[in-house]
Amino acid sequence: MPLTQTPSIFTVSRLNQSVRLLLEQEMGQVWISGEISNFTQPASGHWYFTLKDDTAQVRCAMFRNSNRRVTFRPQHGQQVLVRANITLYEPRGDYQIIVESMQPAGEGLLQQRYEQLKQQLAAEGLFDPALKKPLPSPARQVGVITSKTGAALHDVLNVLRRRDPSLPVVIYPTAVQGDDAPAQIVRAIELANLRDECDVLIVGRGGGSLEDLWSFNDERVARAIFASRIPIVSAVGHETDVTIADFVADLRAPTPSAAAEIVSRNQLELLRQVQALQQRLEMAMDYSLANRQQRFTRLHHRLEQQHPQLRLARQQTLLMRLRQRMDNALDSRMRHATQRQTRLMQRLNQQQPLPRLHRASARVQQLEYRLGQIVAARLSHTRERFGNAITHLEAVSPLATLARGYSVTTAQDGNVLKATKQVRPGDTLTTRLADGWVESEVRQITPAKKTRKKKTG
């Protein structure tokens, strides 16, 4: 007779254990929607209830460490969405589910859609940190995409006025709640990119329920944020509210006010920049004045080494040009410095840093006064030395010799007359005296008699 294989024989315990493992390993974690009934909460704090629909029911348990995170009190007959693990209670062989999280049915379905879209976009790389665009520092103009009547816009504008009142703001009004809101938000983002007038955008709204914030979990909005060439800061709801837009944006701010803080500069930073610019201005003025003074000294020394009147005149002309250039350069620097100071003071006046601004203004006035005194003293000293040099040159000038009674006579060819053989009767001669010229005609030429030396015997 052929041998027959003995079938496997399970004990009840082994059977229940095998079924439990099969359920836990094969089914894993699932989402289940249904109606609560037979809800109880013993002293242990755990929740026990039945989840049912029109044709079936299943026993459920939700342990205390999980049900503490539920934000509402479950009621009999309430429709809910739960995330649970399927298992088997071995001692009694009861099939049941262990609930990890619970939400009202409406929010639960939205949460399920949220998780599905989040996984899809993450798989496509829309959340990749390497693709995040850096924010400009500092921002030259900020765009705000939100409701024009909402509290979020009010909060953003208040923060920007307090921190950086000179920062321009462009508002792109849009609905942030309702069926039309996602399309309007997408159009606002596309419009901001088309106009290209801002270098950073704040996209967001105030707090609300999951349904209120759902526009920012819309796939169209997420893809518009990802496609934006302009960096986007998301600011949706409160710090505990996290939307799909937060994952896609280049930076997430917990609130609209925090977003305004991120994209703006504060008054202290601007004041530090003004102080640094003032220090650079003072150093540039001192350096320029020292260079001009050294150059003037060298030119004056070279001028003193020149004796002929013509060279002196040339050096005088050069000195005047250099002095004019120096004056123009100083005037130009002072004008540019004054204009820059005026612009900075206007910005500071808008931010009310009055005590430091008064001190800075007083310092600039002192420097202007000192600069005027130094330039005036240098010019006076130069004029005095230049006058002395002219007096000295005039003392040794040929004109001074003429003033003592001498004269210079030139022939018709313009050469200085040194001998009688250079002229003939009838020639016209020109004689230079100290106070003018005299023209005369030669009538007679009488050579001087040569003096003979006596012979020594």
Curated annotation (Swiss-Prot):
Catalytic activity: Exonucleolytic cleavage in either 5'- to 3'- or 3'- to 5'-direction to yield nucleoside 5'-phosphates
EC top class named in words: hydrolase
Subcellular compartments: Cytoplasm
GO CC annotations, alphabetized: cytoplasm; exodeoxyribonuclease VII complex
GO molecular function, one term: exodeoxyribonuclease VII activity
InterPro entries for the chain: Exonuc_VII_L, Exonuc_VII_lsu_C, OB-fold_nuc-bd_dom
EC number from the UniProt entry: 3.1.11.6
Assembly notes: Heterooligomer composed of large and small subunits.
Chain's role: Bidirectionally degrades single-stranded DNA into large acid-insoluble oligonucleotides, which are then degraded further into small acid-soluble oligonucleotides.
Protein name: Exodeoxyribonuclease 7 large subunit
Organism: Cronobacter sakazakii (strain ATCC BAA-894)
Gene responsible for this protein: xseA
